[in-house]
Amino acid sequence: MEWIAHHQAAGVTDFLIYSNDCDDGTGEILDALAAAGEIVHLPQTKTGSQSIQWQALRDAWKHPLRKKADWILVSDVDEFLNIHVAGHQISDLLKALPDDTDAVALPWRLFGNNDIVFAKDAPVTAQFTTSAPAECSSPIAATLFKSLIRAGGPFNQLGVHRPKQKPATKAGLPKWVDGSGNQMPGVFAANQKRLSLYSLPSGRSLAEMNHYSLRSAESFLIKRDRGLPNRKDKEIDLTYWVERNFNTERNETISAMRPATEKRLSALHRIPGVSDLHGRSVNWHHEKFRALVTQPDFHRLFSRIVLTGSSKVLSKQLTQQLVRWYGEAYRS
């Protein structure tokens, strides 16, 4: 609810939302919002060998909403576009970019759990207000980005972090800029497998992507139970928590967008049935946590993460050494 309201307030006009076998009431909430004309909701069931996220991305590329769009943002519901430009609208951001921009690499900003143990029915952006600093190059997750792309750019498929590009020999390279509107180097534009901004410009003075991948310890247990939509082989475990639980600095920059978000959120809650469905979903999460935390494996994980302190930002020198050792360790 908050995620939709936030991006509606920022100027997103159309939402194409894929849900994946939800049992927490999310599907019913999305159906109610779709019936009211707020979003398009497409429940999906996994078919074939692709991950369910890639299945959705390939389907979305063929959807009429994608075909009529001017700009496109692929985003998970734990990612909030944080626009720093005065006005805090996507239209304000676009005006601040070079005219020939095809894509914006929006750097992730990892937000920690802010020492919040139990889930609350309160805005994510108001609860979790501590993050990694802008300069944070380790672990690799701190250097990832999401892409705001011009629909008419030289692309032929959506991607989790960046779109697939048409052959450069036929369409040329897309004009990429960072979150400050500065042109990205050609090596970045040419290598569409590059998903990290490590050692590359990662400006964020115009916009960035707040990533609330942990939230409370309670919510994290439910995330562990569900798994990731694109990498079922990746464990949601203590390592995942430590690599993302940065509470290094107070970061409330997104609060400038909250008044407009709250207006939209109130409007969404006035849609018949939505508030009741939301309340049921909140109760489901609390009940699910209680069922999980009394199981040995989940209890062990919960106990460890509440004992674990915030993650430390490594020095540039140590980060570089770790990268060199990584190259040696995984050299084929």
Task: Identify the meaning behind each predicted range.
Residues N20, D76-D78:
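Short acidic donor-binding/metal-coordinating loop in glycosyltransferase active sites
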Residues M1-H6, D21:
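Active-site beta-to-alpha loop of glycosyltransferases that engages the nucleotide-sugar donor
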Residues T13-D14, D70, D102:
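Short acidic/polar active-site loop segments enriched in Thr and Asp
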Residues T13-D21, L42-K46:
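Short beta-strand/loop segment that forms part of the nucleotide-sugar
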Residues A5-D14:
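Short, acidic, metal-binding catalytic loop of nucleotide-sugar glycosyltransferases
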Residues I83-T308, R331:
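Catalytic-site signature of metal-activated, phosphate-bearing donor transferases
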Residues G25-I72, N82-V85:
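Active-site-proximal specificity loops/subdomain of glycosyltransferases
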Residues T319-V323, G327-R331:
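Charge-dense, extended regions
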